[in-house]
Amino acid sequence: MFRLWNQLTKPRVTVLVLATVLPGMYLGTTGYPSLTVISITLFGTYLMSSASFILNQYIERERDAVMYRTKQRPIPAGEISPTFALLLGIVVAIVSFGILTYFINLLTAVCALAALLLYVFLYTIWLKPRTEQNIVIGGISGCIGPLIGYAAMANALPMQAWVMFLMIFLWTPAHFWALAIFLKDDYEFAGIPMMPVVSGIEKTVNQIFLYAIAYSLSVIGFYFVDDRMGYLFLLSAIVLTVLILGFAYRLKLSMDKVLAKRFFFFSILHLFLVSIAIVIDSKI
């Protein structure tokens, strides 16, 4: 059962979501956030993220069955029924909303629920099967982590929270398009219009490079938005910017699928390190 839960809920992806919640929590209070509030907020967010992925796999069960990467997921593999997955996703989402509303505040719960609704309805159902820009618009759902964190501490969403939202919004296309390059044949076989399938790898790597530039500018720009950010964050942002732009430029020149996969994983590490830098510098 634990194995099936992990396959349904993508815990490794959820860890990154939770990592983007923490900076919002640390910026949302003048002191240190309560360990109890942190734990409940992260647990509630974990449940809502898990519900999103369960419902995503319910909706995509037929596409998953024809893709090599996903055909062994629990629903297409016949290990659980679609009806059970649907009910499980709904119940987990309700539990998450209840926990966040009762123990934290309604704004936090609404932000978490908005992330689920955007991911399930806007991205999975509407955009993903229809346009190569699916991840640009649909990726909004993955940007809400800082809003959840800030709302949990301040019960408000000031400019700093929205700049962090923008940061992740600009990070998302380069991150996912790199994976789409590596999995181009799989997406093409399943008829999913990811950018490498529709427009080719050359256009995709050019777009990755442009989004990497925009994302890097937003990271450095955060230093000027929040006066709690000091030279530690600025130095970290500059070093990380040089690294990701260098990586994106190499990918632009080579158009290599293996390098695209490496960029995908590096971008995860990059966002994680940016989040850590924000957390540390906000309290020293």
Curated annotation (Swiss-Prot):
GO terms of biological process kind? heme O biosynthetic process
Which N-terminal stretch is annotated as signal sequence?
Answer: none
Question: Keywords of this protein's UniProt record, alphabetized?
Answer: Cell inner membrane, Cell membrane, Heme biosynthesis, Membrane, Transferase, Transmembrane, Transmembrane helix
CDD domains, A to Z: PT_UbiA_Cox10
Protein's membrane topology: Multi-pass membrane protein
What is this enzyme's catalytic activity, as reactions?
heme b + (2E,6E)-farnesyl diphosphate + H2O = Fe(II)-heme o + diphosphate
TM regions (residue ranges): 13-33, 35-55, 84-104, 106-126, 134-154, 163-183, 205-225, 229-249, 264-284
Task: Name its cellular compartments.
Answer: Cell inner membrane
**GO terms of molecular function:** protoheme IX farnesyltransferase activity
- GO CC terms of this entry: plasma membrane
Q: What is its main location?
A: membrane
Which principal EC class is assigned to this enzyme? transferase
* One Pfam assignment: UbiA
Superkingdom of origin:
Bacteria
Family, similarity comment? Belongs to the UbiA prenyltransferase family. Protoheme IX farnesyltransferase subfamily.
Report the NCBIfam families cross-referenced here: cyoE_ctaB (TIGR01473), PRK04375.1-2 (NF003349)
Q: Which PANTHER family match?
A: 4-HYDROXYBENZOATE SOLANESYLTRANSFERASE (PTHR43448:SF7), PROTOHEME IX FARNESYLTRANSFERASE, MITOCHONDRIAL (PTHR43448)
- What more does the record tell us? Carbon 2 of the heme B porphyrin ring is defined according to the Fischer nomenclature.
Query: What function is annotated for this protein?
Result: Converts heme B (protoheme IX) to heme O by substitution of the vinyl group on carbon 2 of heme B porphyrin ring with a hydroxyethyl farnesyl side group.
Q: What is this protein called in UniProt?
A: Protoheme IX farnesyltransferase
| Species assigned in the record | Leptospira biflexa serovar Patoc (strain Patoc 1 / ATCC 23582 / Paris)
